[in-house]
Swiss-Prot record:
InterPro entries: NAD(P)-bd_dom_sf, Sc_DH/Rdtase_CS, SDR_fam
Organism taxonomic ancestry: Bacteria, Bacillati, Actinomycetota, Actinomycetes, Kitasatosporales
EC numbers for this chain: 1.-.-.-
Name listed for the protein in its UniProt record: Probable oxidoreductase
Keyword Cytoplasm among UniProt keywords: no
Naturally occurring in which organism (per UniProt): Streptomyces antibioticus
Family: Belongs to the short-chain dehydrogenases/reductases (SDR) family.
Length: 298
């Protein structure tokens, strides 16, 4: 895998899955920008990779996905073509309904709307690359949470942390379907489920829930279950979608464990898969319009 001369942006690339993605892309020769709310948090990674003497240069820039002004500033400051955009940053299961300053529910703002704004803001740079790729980190949580167009921000329905998270991840998958309109520009967009991994993503999950998931004992010790992946293993599918020549021209798909996932209709005994509601072209087009209107009103 040779990415020499390619330029990449990885959101949330300072730790966890994002950091492993940055390491892999930089090792292959890509010039990588870590887009993070606190650029100083990425300094250890930047220094680590500089000391390693890899081919790809790594830098960090400020980006707050929940703030449209921050996203616009990042996109406006970008110069030249962009070959790879990895929409990796995310938050999960905020215990109470939290709103971004413009009124967006925070999980939807960070996980979907912010990335939609970033991708559309960088569209010209992606187009100019000739064969750019957008990689969207979704989650199996999308399976049971279709996007609610009537009350996406929980203004009227009771707030549920996991429904809010799942809805935002369903939106991520729908974005890949809606982005088929960019295929003529040479831009492919695919989503993935990285699997079960313990990272800072779980920082808002309370101890009771962690115990119910089986990953915390009575003494408060966190222990991954046998089927959990390491961050490096979880990032493998992101790197595959970002760099593998086998996926040239492939767009609007959902992957897990380095292969395209099967489509499922709802809850099934067998885990995994991608929900049919997240691949619905009509819902994808409707969401694209929803996102465009939301950005216009922000």
């Amino acid at each position: 895998m040779d990415l020499t001369g390619r330029r990449a942006v990885v959101t949330g690339g300072a730790s966890g899955l994002g950091a492993e993605t940055v390491r892999a892309l930089a090792a292959a020769g890509a010039e990588v920008t870590v887009a993070t709310r606190r650029p100083l948090s990425a300094e250890p990674l930047v220094q680590e990779l500089a000391a390693a003497g890899g081919a790809g240069r790594v830098t960090a820039e400020a980006l707050d996905l929940s703030d449209p002004a921050s996203v616009e500033s990042f996109a406006r400051a970008w110069r030249g073509p962009l070959d790879i955009l990895v929409a990796n940053a995310g938050i999960m299961a905020l215990p109470t309904r939290t709103l971004a300053p413009n009124g967006w529910e925070m999980q939807l703002a960070t996980n979907y709307l912010g990335h939609f704004a970033l991708a559309t803001g960088l569209h010209a740079a992606l187009r100019d690359a000739g064969s750019a790729r957008i990689v969207v980190v979704s989650s199996g949580a999308h399976l049971d949470a279709p996007f609610d167009f009537e009350d996406a921000h929980f203004a009227r329905r009771p707030y549920d942390p996991w429904v809010a998270y799942g809805q935002s991840k369903a939106a991520d998958v729908l974005f890949t379907v809606g982005a088929r309109r960019w295929a003529a520009d040479g831009i492919t967009v695919n989503a993935l489920n990285p699997g079960y991994i313990l990272t800072r993503l779980q920082r808002h999950v309370d101890d009771e829930t962690m115990r119910a998931f089986g990953v915390m004992d009575d003494q408060g010790n966190v222990k991954p279950l046998p089927y959990y992946k390491t961050p490096e293993q979880g990032a493998a599918t992101s790197v595959l979608l970002a760099a593998s020549p086998l996926l040239k021209g492939v767009t609007g798909r959902y992957f897990e464990d380095n292969q395209e996932a099967r489509t499922v209709q709802g809850q099934e005994d067998q885990p995994g898969g991608v929900a049919a509601h997240a691949l619905d072209p009509e819902a994808a087009d409707r969401l694209w319009e929803y996102g465009t209107d939301a950005l216009r009103a922000a």
